[in-house]
Amino acid sequence: MEAIISFAGIGINYKKLQSKLQHNFGRLLKALTVTARALPGQPKHIAIRQETAFTLQGEYIYFPILLRKQFEMFNMVYTAHPVSLRALPCVETEFPLFNYQQEMVDKIHKKLLSPYGRFYLHLNTGLGKTRIAISIIQKLLYPTLVIVPTKAIQIQWIDELTLLLPHLRVAAYNNAACKKKDMTSKEYDVIVGIINTLRKKPEQFFEPFGLVVLDEAHELHSPENYKIFWKIQLSRILGLSATPLDRPDGMDKIIIHHLGQPQRTVSPTTTFSGYVREIEYQGHPDFVSPVCINEKVSAIATIDKLLQDPSRIQLVVNEAKRLYSLHTAEPHKWGTDEPYGIIIFVEFRKLLEIFYQALSKEFKDVQIIVPEVALLCGGVSNTALSQAHSASIILLTYGYGRRGISFKHMTSIIMATPRRNNMEQILGRITRQGSDEKKVRIVVDIKDTLSPLSSQVYDRHRIYKKKGYPIFKCSASYQQPYSSNEVLIWDPYNESCLACTTTPPSPSKQKHT
């Protein structure tokens, strides 16, 4: 049987393959279809999403090249689209890697040497996925396209590439660059582009790239972003992710058909001291009742209602003041000679401005950066992102901040709204590889005791215990938005511990895994 290999993958005549497989044809297509799991509170009128690891183009059905072994029994005769790749300049440049990074570089390099090589790297947040990928770029010496989800991550890639591989011509590909001229791999050795822009490019744009790096690869499951896979099949592909199979709806499984099963590395031994301050908050009755849609609790609408409580907003401000006061008044006590940085996470963009206004009234002389707010106006500025690296307080949504944004001076988190998913990535914002291990990490977690979302705290407890962070409980209410003294409810070294304390705990050492 004849087949073609092109940008879109392995193309086989639809009718001939159907005739060859007969009743197994339907089974094959079913096996290559991922159906989303229904989420709690999801309205019934919203259709259950499906995505397929095949696509139809005219008389042909295309499959990911990774699946070509499944067709070996048919003695396939392939006609491949010709690809001519130039070699990047070979300059001996060395930069340090940890042992676990070097081991993974060797493993990835071996896999990507072969044409159409694929590798899906699973490495926890803050452990240097970018540096591993840059080492692969240096070894393969192919023109490379790096695809990232946000401008903030794009800037980080540009900075890291320029620092580690200064001899290469590196460029950022975005809407502004598109208007000036059409960048190609002939002009640049490495192009770093944002998915929202690159997914609109024709197949021919991707032809000159011998290597494509997909940062935050698990996020390419969305209907629009997923289309990129049917344009890059001729390249070697390296996918990077801290949470490759972590979506509640399971749609990130579709990525496996293109990249293979995620491969983990040996855990490093970086340690961080830290603890959790859990505040049990009793909100005003007007704001804690659940919001139901189609007789099911809607988490989004319920969170929106919770944050209409002015006392709850004041509680977050008070906690920020408390952290800032501790860090600035007694930095030596907390293991540092300079103030900490504080990240405040919220669920929705519209809450960023609400908290910004509330914080600005209390922190008149403190730099507060909201790098995401500018996105509402068409794009975050380079200036705002640059300022964020020295800001004392940063406001982010969970969706934006959980991606690989690196602020190494940030060591405290306030979770201003409830959260269940992506907790590994959220905590990773304050446990970046290369940041100061001596600084104590602090997580402020607000549990809305009268809300149906309060049970989500137990999912967070599971992650805290995995990290080895003791949990200290205190209370507050809409009548008294100042948290009480702390009570130790869990200690990684003493499960039965229930000791009272009003001073910062002796933090545990967390192995960064």
Curated annotation (Swiss-Prot):
> What is this protein's name?
Putative ATP-dependent RNA helicase QP509L
> What SMART domains does the record point to?
DEXDc (SM00487)
Q: Which residues form the Helicase ATP-binding domain?
A: 110-262
| Native species | African swine fever virus (isolate Warthog/Namibia/Wart80/1980)
**InterPro entries the record matches:** Helicase/UvrB_N, Helicase_ATP-bd, Helicase_Restrict-Modif_Enz, P-loop_NTPase
Q: Which reaction does it catalyse?
A: ATP + H2O = ADP + phosphate + H(+)
Show which residues constitute the signal peptide.
Answer: none
Q: Which UniProt keywords apply?
A: ATP-binding, Helicase, Hydrolase, Late protein, Nucleotide-binding
Q: Which family does it belong to?
A: Belongs to the DEAD box helicase family. DEAH subfamily.
Q: Single GO molecular-function term? A: ATP binding
Q: Where is ATP annotated to bind? A: L123, N124, T125, G126, L127, G128, K129, T130
- Give the induction text: Expressed in the late phase of the viral replicative cycle.
Residues spanned by motif DEAH box: 215-218
Cite the EC number: 3.6.4.13
